[in-house]
Every structure is written in structure tokens, then in C-alpha cells.
Swiss-Prot record:
Pfam families: DASH_Dad2
Residue ranges with Basic and acidic residues bias: 84-109
Subunit structure: Component of the DASH complex consisting of ASK1, DAD1, DAD2, DAD3, DAD4, DAM1, DUO1, HSK3, SPC19 and SPC34, with a stoichiometry of one copy of each subunit per complex. Multiple DASH complexes oligomerize to form a ring that encircles spindle microtubules and organizes the rod-like NDC80 complexes of the outer kinetochore. DASH complex oligomerization strengthens microtubule attachments. On cytoplasmic microtubules, DASH complexes appear to form patches instead of rings.
Keyword Signal: no
Species of provenance: Candida glabrata (strain ATCC 2001 / BCRC 20586 / JCM 3761 / NBRC 0622 / NRRL Y-65 / CBS 138) (Yeast)
Highest rank taxon of the organism: Eukaryota
Keywords of this entry: Cell cycle, Cell division, Centromere, Chromosome, Chromosome partition, Coiled coil, Cytoplasm, Cytoskeleton, Kinetochore, Microtubule, Mitosis, Nucleus
Protein family (similarity comment): Belongs to the DASH complex DAD2 family.
Function, as annotated: Component of the DASH complex that connects microtubules with kinetochores and couples microtubule depolymerisation to chromosome movement; it is involved in retrieving kinetochores to the spindle poles before their re-orientation on the spindle in early mitosis and allows microtubule depolymerization to pull chromosomes apart and resist detachment during anaphase.
GO molecular function: microtubule plus-end binding
A GO biological-process term: mitotic sister chromatid biorientation
Transmembrane segments annotated in the record for this chain: none
Protein name as it appears in the record: DASH complex subunit DAD2
Amino acid sequence: MDGLEQQKLAKQQELAALKRITALTDQMRTELDEMSIEVSKINKNAESVANVMANWDSIRKYISEASLGLLRYAEGDYQVGAWDGKENKSDKSNADKSYQSDDEHKTEPLPEALVRISVANNEESRK
């Protein structure tokens, strides 16, 4: 009977070891599942960052074009009263000129406005 008791103890120890291995395997599977979810989130965020970075070249180009539009005005154009002495060279009649207010001639020139321009890549990003 001594041999049987030793085999029984050996089998119980083996069973306990297998239960620990099973528990550790389940825990590792759970952690790997959570890690795969986090990796997929990181992947989506990386794609978003890549899309934003792809737009920076066009944004920089549009800002540059807008700032170049300001270069056509001299410093004197922004001084108060600089537009008062200039004559209206349009071919409008005097009746049409009477509808224009005096304030219209005294305003400073405004910079060109930025407008949205559709980019050909928009169709690709929607897919």
C-alpha cells in the first residue's frame, strides 16, 4: 500500500501543478486580450496622427499664400487717411458715386480671406 499512497500523492501534486498552470494560462490570456485591445487603439491613433500630418503641407501652403497676399500692400496703405487723396478711377457716373459712402474710401485694405479648397485626397480618406 505504500506504493499506492506514493502514487496517489504524486498524482495529487501533479494535479495541483496543472491547476496552477491552467490558472496562470487563463490570466495570461486575459492580459493578452487586454493588450491586443490597447494595441488596436494605438494603431487607430497612429492613423489619425498620420492623417493630420499629411494635411500639414497643404495648411502651410495656404498660410504662405495668404501671407504673400499681404505683401502687395505698402506700409502707407495702413495709415489713417492714406486713401482720402486717391481719386476714384472707375467709369461710374456721378450718380453712382453719390451712393458710395465717404467711409468706404477711408477704410484700410483688408487682407485676402482664406477659403476652403477641396483636396483630391478627401475622397480617398472617406473610404
